[in-house]
Regions:
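Generic, well-ordered alpha-helical segments
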Residues: 52-56, 80, 87
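N-terminal beta1-alpha1-beta2 module of alpha/beta enzyme domains
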Residues: 1-67, 71-72
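Positions that flank functional sites
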Residues: 48-49, 79-80, 111
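Secondary-structure boundary/capping signal
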Residues: 72-73, 103
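Flexible, glycine-rich active-site loops centered on histidine and acidic residues
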Residues: 2-21, 82-136
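Structural motif
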Residues: 44, 76, 106-108
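Active-site nucleophile and cofactor-binding loops and adjacent substrate-binding regions
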Residues: 75-83
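Glycine- and other small-residue-rich loops at beta-strand/loop junctions that grip anionic moieties
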Residues: 53, 77, 126
Length: 136
């Protein structure tokens, strides 16, 4: 029996934090995960998290693809009902190329009303939008 380990890089910081320094910290954590033999690195996604600051998921995954090679990079999770499917497909296809084919798409329907309001998408329609976007 074997087990693969994944490191989750939250990338969530208090207002006023030095985000350039935090980005370097995340890069170092990702490199350490690779050195320690982790199978993958997962990057979450949240919006409207004030007063907290976040790195955008796709930007962070692209950055990590340039920093760490030969490790799985995982969207954990992309909130698919909030986005246009073609845009998401192109973004993550690019990350897959940048990572040498090591990208894994994780998606979900979301649960925070503030994120749906911020994107102008009714939360009550998230299941329907998720299915439609997944099919597209």
């Amino acid at each position: 029996m074997s087990m693969d380990l994944i490191m989750v890089l939250r990338g969530q910081y208090n207002a006023g934090e030095d985000m350039a320094a935090r980005l370097e910290d995340l890069s170092n954590q990702a490199k350490l995960a690779k050195e320690l033999g982790y199978w993958g690195i997962a990057v979450p996604s949240h919006f409207s998290g004030a007063p907290l600051q976040y790195f955008h998921q796709t930007s962070m995954l692209a950055y990590l693809a340039a920093q760490v090679k030969d490790i799985k990079l995982i969207s954990a999770v992309n909130l698919l009902p909030l986005h246009k499917p073609m845009d998401i497909a192109e973004q993550y296809a690019s990350i897959d190329v940048m990572s040498g084919g090591n990208f894994i798409f994780g998606t979900g329907i979301g649960y925070r009303d503030v994120e749906f309001k911020g994107h102008g998408s009714p939360m009550a329609e998230r299941g329907k939008r998720f299915e439609e976007n997944l099919e597209a």
